Structure formats: structure tokens, C-alpha cells
UniProtKB/Swiss-Prot annotation:
Cofactor: Mg(2+)
GO molecular function (one): hydroxyethylthiazole kinase activity
Protein name: Hydroxyethylthiazole kinase
Pfam family, one: HK
Family: Belongs to the Thz kinase family.
Binding site for ATP: 117, 163
Entries under SUPFAM superfamilies matching the protein: Ribokinase-like
EC number(s) from the headed UniProt entry: 2.7.1.50
Alphabetized NCBIfam families for the sequence: PRK09355.1, thiM
Residues that bind substrate: 41, 190
Catalytic activity: 5-(2-hydroxyethyl)-4-methylthiazole + ATP = 4-methyl-5-(2-phosphooxyethyl)-thiazole + ADP + H(+)
UniProt keyword terms in alphabetical order: ATP-binding, Kinase, Magnesium, Metal-binding, Nucleotide-binding, Thiamine biosynthesis, Transferase
The UniProt record lists the keyword Magnesium: yes
């Protein structure tokens, strides 16, 4: 591929507003700093409108929801739409509880998302496709993952990103399949949450017409950083991988993305 967005991200250092969960907040902030963005972590409803006007992108992550969070998410999302910055939804464990289901439905009804990023089980639920999930984990299903990505992208007029052993990215017409990564990703908590934040950072430096390409590069960059970090590690070195991932996000170059990205288009 021809990396275009990583250099822009590091030059512009976009401010990314994260309404995320208590498990992921620290890791997401450090990961954004590593790749070249500037994170701000706030779910305080009193400052949501101002945050949207200060930021270049917004991530809404439902991982550890409270009632107050929902109000803040809705206000932040609607204000972000008004000022014209991209919004990413990470519907963590959406199928697990009624509260998550109702919250996600409300968000999708009232906020226009630029991208929705989750695992296969989460996006299958949003697409209305039968899937067996386990809490916030992907679970298993017989449906075609590429078709799920297309369904979500078309239904919500956004870019759908389904992450897993293979990542699927769809804008409703085009489909990219990314084959980088490492089995260590699902062994550390919040690796998907950080990916959503990275997606938001890449969208922050892209024109709307280029969102698909920006997310293909952003997801590839993240997966390649993980792949490089895992090269000298055993399958049980979770802690070393966590630190190594941050190091590789910081040192990753456009040339490495171009060299190592394994992408197919349909």
C-alpha cells in the first residue's frame, strides 16, 4: 500500500476526545500518544459541547456504561455532528445486556457515526445477524463476516470495521481484508478499544471521501505494530507485548506499513 495518513497524523497531532471505559482509558491514551495523536479522556456531560468544538475526532466506547455516560455520549455525538468532526462507535459487548442494546440503538438513532468498529459478534448484533457471543468477546457464528460488514456500512452510512484474525473494512461497496496481526492481541485487555481510538486518530486527518482508505491504513498500522512487537515473544508474554505494542506504535514508519501490509480488496 501507499501510506498517506501516518505522516499527516504525526505532523498535525490531532486532539482525540475519548468517552471510553475504565478498563481501556489509560491504554488508549498511551497508545494515541505513541502513534502521534493527543488524547483527552472525559465523560463529564458539563463539558461535552466544548470538547467537541476543541477536538478533531471523537470515540464513543460503551465498555463500562453508566446512565450518566449515555447522556454525555449523546450530547457529545450530536455536537460532533454539528461541528463536523468524525465520530467512531465501539459497541463493546452490545449483545450482552439489555442496557447495552438500548444504549447502542439510541446512539445509532441520534448520532451519525463515521465508523463503527467492533468484533464479529458485536457487528453481527448491530446488523441483525444471528451470532453466539460470550460477554464482550466475539464468540462464534456461521454468517459471512464480509457480508456483516457490508450490512452495517450500508444501514448506517458509515465505514464498518470488524477486527479479528482477519480484519474486514467496508464502506458498503468496497471491502478490504487485512491479514496482519498476532494471536497476542486478544490476550490483552483493551486492544480493540485502542484500535478504535487509533481509527479515530486516522479519521481526524482525513477528508470524508478518504475515510475508507484512512481506516485501511490505520488498522494496518496497528496490526503491523502488534506483529512486530510479538516477533521475539512467547505466547505467554502478555505484559511484554503490551509494552512492545506501545513502543512499535511510536516507532512505526510509513515504509514499514508499505512493506508489511497484507491487504486484499473485493
Amino acid at each position: 500500500m501507499n501510506s498517506q495518513f501516518l505522516t499527516k497524523l504525526r505532523q498535525r497531532n490531532p486532539l482525540i476526545h475519548n468517552i471510553t471505559n475504565i478498563v481501556a482509558a489509560n491504554f488508549s491514551a498511551n497508545g494515541l500518544l505513541a502513534i502521534g495523536a493527543s488524547p483527552i479522556m472525559s465523560a463529564c456531560i458539563e463539558e461535552m459541547e466544548e470538547m467537541a468544538k476543541l477536538s478533531q475526532s471523537l470515540v464513543i466506547n460503551i465498555g463500562t456504561l453508566t446512565g450518566k455516560d449515555v447522556e454525555a455520549m449523546l450530547l457529545a455525538g450530536k455536537t460532533a455532528n454539528q461541528v463536523g468532526i468524525p465520530v467512531v462507535l465501539d459497541p463493546v459487548g452490545v449483545g450482552a445486556t439489555t442496557f447495552r442494546q438500548k444504549t447502542t440503538a439510541l446512539l445509532l438513532e441520534q448520532v451519525q457515526f463515521s465508523a463503527i468498529r467492533g468484533n464479529a459478534g458485536e457487528l453481527a448484533y448491530i446488523a441483525g445477524v444471528q451470532w453466539s457471543t460470550k460477554g464482550v468477546d466475539a464468540g462464534k457464528g456461521m454468517a459471512d463476516i464480509a457480508e456483516i460488514a457490508h450490512l452495517v456500512a450500508r444501514k448506517y452510512q458509515c465505514i464498518a470495521v470488524i477486527s479479528g484474525e482477519t480484519d474486514y473494512i467496508s464502506d458498503g461497496k468496497r471491502l478490504a481484508k487485512l491479514n496482519n496481526g498476532t494471536p497476542l492481541f486478544p490476550k490483552i485487555t483493551a486492544s480493540g478499544c485502542l484500535l478504535s481510538a487509533v481509527c479515530s486518530a486516522f479519521l481526524a486527518v482525513a477528508e470524508q471521501k478518504d475515510y475508507f482508505d484512512a481506516l485501511v491504513e490505520g488498522c494496518s498500522a496497528y496490526a503491523i505494530a502488534g506483529e512486530i512487537a510479538a516477533q521475539s515473544l512467547s505466547s505467554t508474554q502478555f505484559g511484554q507485548f503490551t509494552l512492545g505494542l506501545l513502543d512499535q506504535l511510536a516507532s512505526l514508519t510509513p515504509e514499514q506499513i508499505n512493506q508489511y501490509a497484507r491487504i486484499s480488496y473485493e
